[in-house]
Regions:
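Non-catalytic beta/alpha edge segments that cap or flank active sites
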Residues: 1-159
Length: 159
């Protein structure tokens, strides 16, 4: 079974100013994909996101998906702190998520989310909107098991 963790990057939700809805949606979506899911863990954007990512990697989680903090606001720092945790990026995942979303909502192109690997953990940034989460899940669905298998040392299937 794939072990997943959901981290919500939202300074306002972490302060109790509003109730986040994208985190529970992401948890449910990952469970539908067959994952055992921790979270959602709601943290302020910025360094608390990096700390939560490092904790997930240290805990041996297979995949950690963040929601929020990927926009253009000066407060949106999730991609920057994620980059500092990653060993390497997987640009194709983030590109596919943006392309999928752009088909319905042109502003999906403004998401700065990243995807990559830290240790043996797949890390994916998603937007904080429910639509952005659904788009991310649609893209991750066919990729997740294969990506995790490779990170666990599996071979590429031969076709």
């Amino acid at each position: 079974m794939i072990r997943a963790r959901v981290i919500v990057a939202s300074t306002r939700a972490a302060a109790g100013a509003y109730v986040d809805t994208s985190g529970p949606l992401l948890v449910a979506g990952l469970r539908d994909l067959g994952c055992e899911v921790d979270g959602p863990i709601v943290v302020e954007d910025g360094e608390p996101v990096a700390q939560a990512l490092r904790a997930a990697v240290a805990d041996g989680v297979d995949v950690v998906v963040t929601s929020g903090g990927t926009g253009l606001s000066p407060r949106d720092r999730t991609p920057e702190v994620t980059r500092g945790v990653l060993d390497y990026e997987i640009p194709g995942i983030a590109e596919a998520i943006r392309a999928y979303g752009r088909e319905k909502v042109p502003t999906a192109a403004l998401s700065r989310g990243l995807a990559g690997v830290a240790g043996r953990t797949l890390v994916v940034n998603l937007p904080g909107s429910p639509g952005g989460v659904r788009d991310g899940l649609a893209v991750l669905g066919p990729l997740l098991a294969h990506a995790v298998d490779q990170l666990r040392g599996g071979d590429h299937p031969r076709q």
